[in-house]
Amino acid sequence: MRKRQVVLRRASPEEPSRSSSTASSLTVRTVRYGECQKNHAAAVGGYAVDGCREFMASRGEEGTVAALTCAACGCHRSFHRREIETEVVCDCNSPPSTGN
């Protein structure tokens, strides 16, 4: 299985330059492709899946057509269930609190 990670950096809109008084957040999205959902019996009016449990990229460079084909079942990556995990990390810069 090959994972793809997308990182987005967000800052507040009124922040043209970075200062210590504003907060920004970091959003990390990890995309994973699960079981194959291709209906192999659609041509005859039935429903049958091949049982492939997760996408494994074929031998190919990232971004080529070969990398979009599953090595286990031979289907295109779009037939596999897409799972997105999103993690938001706040980079908050707040003054330390006093124990009153």
Swiss-Prot record:
InterPro entries on file: ZF_HD_homeobox_Cys/His_dimer
Alphabetic keyword roster: Cytoplasm, Developmental protein, Metal-binding, Transcription, Transcription regulation, Zinc, Zinc-finger
Tissue: Mostly expressed in stems, flowers and siliques, and, to a lower extent, in inflorescence.
Gene Ontology biological-process annotations: floral meristem determinacy; plant-type ovary development
One Pfam family linked to the record: ZF-HD_dimer
Domain of life, source organism: Eukaryota
Function: Inhibits zinc finger homeodomain (ZHD) transcription factors by interacting with them to prevent both their nuclear localization and their DNA-binding properties. Involved in integrating signals from multiple hormones by regulating the expression of specific genes.
Name of the featured protein: Mini zinc finger protein 2
Lineage: Eukaryota, Viridiplantae, Streptophyta, Embryophyta, Tracheophyta
